[in-house]
A protein has these predicted regions:
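N-acyltransferase acceptor-side catalytic subdomain
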Residues: 1-441
Length: 441
């Protein structure tokens, strides 16, 4: 069907709203990527007296005081990590960083990722052939057709590589939560206007992964026009005070799960696990990337696709905090897992393995147990953050679901109210049963 003329579009705001909501396909989209080359970070006065904003486009230009506001040991927003992700960026990803000043003193900061979210490409189940009865197949085709035109240029306040609140930090001794969130929203709006001046027009803003129990920030964001929606829980294993060794952890299990763990260890004896240094990661770079894609390609929902050089860039930037462990069968790398030390917690980062070997060697389950052992005996942290996906098997090793909420705001007011419903409609559903290896379930 021939699209309406330009004259008609100019006379019909609703038509323009619809067109901006359904962004064009990749082939049609000729808008340039944001320009990160010029990073003079001009200071902008905000609406609150004495408060100013600096927008940086590269982590290398962030001042040293950026790290000073972070909680002790926080790595996901550190300059070291941010520089590493820029050296090996995810496909189609750009970055921006906000610094908030009050009376010339830094009182807040936010790390943003800029990407185009293409629904059909990033939700695997929509790409598959429909199954089920006639109505189920019809519903699948409707969702697929709708999703094929549901594309957004997003400012993501947070980190798509992780689950959890790695979006912003504010000094709450100088700002109350409502004031902090008002500044965050104003800063993100300033960023959107700055990007539009470069030729990259954002359709919406996503602030990701606030904990359900956090009552201050969500309320403030809703007052700013954001709508919250739950999106798959973060699986977290908190350690008990009397767990000093991995054996202590095993002894706390009920018999059924302890037997299961020992059975997995027995199956895993056919593999050799070794920590990989920078040289080994570089040597195995192709294999690591292939193994990562073996698993990432099977995930129903993927917000990003890592580049081949990501693991090496991270190891070079954070040699002590970032660790990679390889699993070998007869000197052939068949799997790997990675961890990132983040203050009082150990983050289970990306992993990969040969799916056809998983059952015989209980490869994935052994990786989970190994990360628990490392967290207890080597890193000596308080918890392991296992992130999203594979919820049931993670609960079988003791991880508990922590509800996370994302907050979204479409920059077109016509569709802002409808967006949360669309997100819930398209969200992949994972049916699972929580396990209780320590009893009480």
């Amino acid at each position: 069907m021939k699209p309406p003329s330009i004259d008609y579009a100019e006379k019909c705001p609703l038509y323009q709203s619809v067109q901006s909501f359904f962004s064009p396909s990749i082939a049609e989209d000729v808008s340039p990527s944001p320009d990160a080359s010029a990073d003079s970070a001009p200071i902008r006065a905000l609406s609150v007296a004495g408060v100013e904003l600096a927008i940086h486009r590269t982590a290398s230009n962030l001042p040293g005081l950026w790290d000073e506001l972070l909680p002790e040991g926080q790595q996901m927003m550190s300059r070291a990590y941010l520089r590493a992700q820029e050296q090996a960026p995810a496909e189609g990803m750009e970055y921006a960083y906000l610094l908030f000043y009050q009376d010339k003193q830094v009182v807040g900061q936010a790390a943003c990722q800029l990407m185009e979210f293409r629904t059909l490409r990033q939700i695997q189940s929509l790409q598959q052939a429909p199954e089920g009865n006639i109505m189920g197949r019809l519903w699948h085709r409707i969702k697929r057709a709708f999703a094929s035109r549901l594309n957004f240029k997003l400012i993501i306040c947070g980190a798509t590589q992780f689950t959890g609140q790695h979006a912003f930090v504010f000094n709450l001794t100088r700002l109350d939560p409502d004031g902090a969130m008002a500044l965050l929203d104003e800063g993100l709006q300033c960023l959107a206007r700055s990007l539009q001046a470069e030729g990259w027009r954002a359709d919406g803003i996503l602030i990701k992964d606030l904990e359900k129990g956090n009552t201050f920030f969500p309320r403030s964001l809703e007052e700013q026009g954001y709508a919250g929606f739950p999106f798959q829980p973060n699986m977290v294993l908190p350690f008990r005070p009397d767990w000093n060794t991995f054996d202590d952890y095993l002894e706390a299990m009920v018999s059924k799960y302890r037997v299961r763990a020992r059975r997995a260890f027995k199956k895993g004896k056919g593999l050799a696990a070794r920590e990989l240094n920078e040289e080994s990661i570089q040597h195995h770079q192709e294999e690591i990337y292939h193994l990562y894609n073996e698993i990432a390609g099977r995930a129903d929902f993927n917000m990003l696709s890592l580049p081949k050089g990501y693991f090496l860039a991270l190891k070079r930037a954070m040699p002590q905090q970032f660790r990679v462990f390889g699993y070998y069968r007869q000197e052939t790398l068949v799997g790997f897992c990675s961890t990132l030390s983040n203050g009082p917690e150990l983050e289970a980062h990306f992993m990969g393995f040969k799916p056809e070997l998983n059952l015989n060697y209980q490869l994935y389950l052994n990786m989970l147990y190994d990360m628990i052992r490392i967290a207890l005996e080597e890193e000596q942290v308080d918890k392991v953050v296992f992130s999203r996906t594979a919820l049931e098997i993670k609960s079988s090793v003791g991880a508990e679901p922590l509800e996370m909420y994302c907050y979204v705001r479409h920059l077109n007011p016509v569709f802002n109210r409808a967006l949360p419903g669309l997100v819930r409609w398209l969200e992949p559903k994972e049916e699972w049963q929580q396990r209780h290896p320590f009893g009480g379930g």
